Amino acid sequence: MKQAINNLKDYAELAQASYFYFDLLKDSNGIARKIYELDSKGNKIEDTSYPRGYKEVAISLEHIVSKEYRGQEALINLKQDDTWKSNLLNTLDEKTNFNQLNGEFNPLQVQNFAKRYKICFHQPNTKSGFSATLFSEKRKQKDTESKEIKYTNKYGYINYILAIISTESKEVV
């Protein structure tokens, strides 16, 4: 009975996580997207070595699921060549980018979730409102040196969980 209750809690957490925007991890070319790195007061850190003039970090699973980053803009990957066309496209992309992280997990949930699960596949919302995420659960193993029990994917995964959701359609199908 206790195991069944724990399984229900785990599945409820995965169901909640399936609504997060995992498609913001990478762009359509498979390149990691970024967010601005913030200081302890929540301000962007200036750094002229970055194209936008502020320090940027790659978006991780922890960023996606954490409520600490909720509402933070997921930056568009800029075109690197310095042609007028690329500069124009970069400017337009920046002005029309409304992608924001939408995580809701508290710090302990974030830590446990990131240790335990991996995102195998994510289908972002389609025009019909369909979305799906395939999670894999890592195995619990005892480390031979430290004797610590931790999650690992070294020997494969113990479960695959498919979360299918439906959101409001933006168009009539």
Residue ranges and their predicted role:
Residues 1-173:
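Non-catalytic, mobile gating and regulatory segments of ester bond hydrolases
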